[in-house]
Structures are given as C-alpha cells and as structure tokens.
A protein has these predicted regions:
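Residues on the lipid-exposed face of transmembrane beta-strands in outer-membrane beta-barrel proteins
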Residues: 30-34, 52-56, 96-100, 124-128, ...
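Short glycine/proline- and aromatic-enriched beta-strand/turn motifs that initiate or cap beta-hairpins
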Residues: 19-57, 220
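Residues that define the transmembrane beta-barrel architecture of outer-membrane proteins
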Residues: 24, 44-50, 90-94, 118, ...
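Gram-negative (and chloroplast) outer-membrane scaffold detector with strong preference
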Residues: 62-141
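Structural signature of outer-membrane beta-barrel domains
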Residues: 35-37, 71-75, 103, 127-133, ...
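Extracellular loop and loop/strand-boundary signature of outer-membrane beta-barrel proteins
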Residues: 36-40, 77-88, 144-152, 201-207
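Predominantly the C-terminal beta-signal and adjacent terminal strand-loop region
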Residues: 78, 91, 168-234
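Short loop/turn motifs that connect adjacent beta-strands in outer-membrane beta-barrel proteins
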Residues: 20-25, 61, 105-118, 169-178, ...
C-alpha cells in the first residue's frame, strides 16, 4: 500500500510541476508607429511617433507599467479645411497603463488556437500629454484678420485605452526572454490643447473630446526577479 501511495504522490507532484512555469517580472520595450488625430478639424491626418515602456508583471498576463511617447500629431489642411485650419503638434506623452491578457481568463493549454492568442490583451490608464505646436494656422488666411484662439503649448490630462497582442519567445532555459508587441491605443484628452485651437463652441460646434490614436509595433526584453505561474507558458 505504501509504494502505491508514494507513486501517487510523485505523480501528483509531477503533474503540478508540469502545470507551472517561471517568468521574469519586469520588461522594457521600445517601438514606433503611426498616430492619427480626431480633433475639431475635418481632416484626420497621420503622424509618426516612437515610444519606450517599462512594465511590472504580477503574473505573465497581468501588468502595470509606465509608457513615454514622442512624435507628431497632425490634422487639418490650410487649403481644404472649411475654416483654413491646420496644425502639427510635436508632442510628448507619459502614462501609467494596466493590462490584462486573455491568458489570465481562459484555459489555453489544450487548445492550439487559444494558446496562440493567449497574448491578446486590453488595458487602460492615465497620464498627461504635453502639446507643442510646430506649425499652426493662427490667423485665418482670408484677409479678415480673425485670430483663432488657442495655445501653442499646453498640457492635457490623458486617458489611454489599449488593445493588442504580444508574442513571447522562450530562451534555452524555458523563460520568456524576448517578445514582439502590436498595440492600438486610443488616447482621450481632457482639454483643448491637442490641436492648438480653443474656439467658441458656438462658432465651431464639436462637443467631443480631442482624441488621437497610436498604432505601434515594438520589441520587449524580459528581465529581473523570477515569479511562478500556475499556468504553463508553452
């Protein structure tokens, strides 16, 4: 009887060990991509921006991190805009982001498709965007002398909403060491500084917050102390 119990205990320990994986608790990453403005101007133009990020992983699928962006947000066209407005915003943004991946919510270990998409995630955060107009049409070019109200430099609170997917690659020791990340971020600003215009809503009807989106591709490096996941990461 004793050998049977010993064998059963050994089997349970083996199964439990197989269902666990080690993971690094910190990542740094960098990447680049395209911004698009959705402000008060008719033309939602594209710009280019880069980013850097640091994340702390509570589990392989739940994280909290810091992100910094720098680049351009563009919009309008002095020739085609109904009010001849245009701006180029050389911006910087900093935010705290929390993310949760699909792998935290599903059992992906017996389904190859679920395993492939376990890195799908959503997230949200809070931060600040620092606006600096590299170019803005401040005086309406129709001879009227009308000056568009607004600031060339300003800071606005920011609410980033993220959706994306991360693919991690194991090193020879079975740890997720490197990764590639595809992210689509919608940034809702709480202010009127993103496009440099703060006109009367009676003259320029909007009612919507200034928004910019950011699609990026980046690389990640995992490092730091090691945690234990109750799910296998393979």
């Amino acid at each position: 009887m004793k050998p049977i119990l010993t064998s059963l205990m050994a089997l349970l320990l083996c199964l439990n060990a197989n269902a666990q994986s080690n993971f690094y608790k910190m990542t740094i990453g960098a990447g680049a991509g395209a911004t698009q403005s959705f402000a008060d101007l008719a033309k939602h133009d594209y710009g280019f921006a880069g980013y850097g990020a640091f994340d702390y992983l509570f589990t392989p699928f739940v994280s909290l991190g810091l992100e910094g962006q720098m680049g351009e947000i563009n919009g309008g066209d002095v020739n085609t805009d109904p009010n001849n407005r245009q701006f180029i915003n050389s911006y910087k943004a900093f935010a705290i982001n929390g993310k949760i991946s699909l792998g935290a919510l599903i059992n992906y270990q017996r389904n190859s498709f679920a395993n492939a998409i376990k890195g799908l995630y959503v997230g949200a955060g809070a931060g600040v965007v620092m606006n600096k107009m590299r170019f803005v049409v401040r005086e309406k070019p129709d001879g009227s002398g009308y000056i568009f109200p607004g600031k060339d430099s300003s800071n606005d609170l920011l609410i980033p909403l993220n959706v994306g997917i991360a693919f991690n690659f194991m090193d020879r020791y079975g740890y997720s060491k490197y990764g590639i990340n595809f992210n689509y971020q919608t940034n809702i600003t709480l202010g009127e500084g993103l496009d440099g215009y703060d006109d009367s809503p009676l003259k320029f009807k909007s009612g919507n917050p200034d928004i910019y989106t950011y699609f990026s591709i980046g690389l990640k490096y995992h490092f730091g102390s090691v945690g234990l996941s109750t799910k296998t990461l393979y």
